[in-house]
Amino acid sequence: MATTKVEKVLNWGVAYTPEMDKGGQRPQPRWDTLRDQVREATDLGYDTAVAVETQHDPFLALAVAAQEPSPIELSTGIALAFTKSPVATAYVAWDLHTMSGGRLVLGLGSQVKGHVTRRFGMPWSKPAQRMKDYVGAMRACWHSWQSGEPLNFKSEHYNLSLMTPNFAPPPIAKPHIPVLIAAVQERMLQVAGEVCDGVRLHGIVTRRYLDEIAFPNLQKGFEKSGRPQAEWKNFEISGGGFLCVAPDRDALARAVEKMKSTIAFYGST
């Protein structure tokens, strides 16, 4: 039977709005509020605290959040994958998983070509195959660190063969780090089903998209993974859909109008 998890997005900064261009200083992030937010999320019954990657590094936010004793998961939702080496991501994920007592859920996404090449100056290649190789490279590192076996991973995008003891973290009590990837198109959905523990769907989805695109391709990938079909119930499907909440009808109408522009933006990219 499927279970439902509720996520709380951590807010340690002030989101950019076009009005900020009219003058005035943009507020600095409030890192000191993160532990309070985790405590509040725990008290309110949330299952996961999520850090997104926009203006600030989500791994730093989770490092702070992990200092608050809590049973809830800590997740990146999402962190950009192609802007860094999979080995670098493997290191920070391993440390955060250890620091949090095994509570990390690693959410990754490819971003679009323009951001990867123009904002970060990194190369772009076939995103679905590259993401599959990226996840495989991370898991190869984690396996090497946990087992002590030599690192040996070869793929189209990444070849790893050096991990001396001086650079290998020690084994940990809970070595499995759940990996979710953001996916929209068929091939990336299949990669999520094949090599990941779950998927993060885009907010701009419809019931028809779920039934005709998302679910069939996730299942197709899952079947390729060789995992027993009984484990499909543990595959996490996160996100999907936009929700407007307001204290009265007038405020709700304004929120809906603002949401229309958000949907138009995503629909045009």
Predicted segments with their positions:
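A cross-family glycoside hydrolase active-site/sugar-binding cleft signature
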Residues: 12-17, 52, 75-77, 107-109, ...
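Receiver (REC) domain switch/active-site residues of two-component response regulators
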Residues: 47, 197-200
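Acidic-and-aromatic substrate-binding clefts and catalytic sites of carbohydrate-active enzymes
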Residues: 49-60, 81-87, 206-210, 244-246
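Alpha-helix-loop-beta-strand connector modules within alpha/beta enzyme cores
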Residues: 61-79, 83, 134, 223-224
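Short, conserved secondary-structure transition motifs
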Residues: 238-251
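Active-site pocket-lining/capping segments in soluble small-molecule metabolic enzymes
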Residues: 252-269
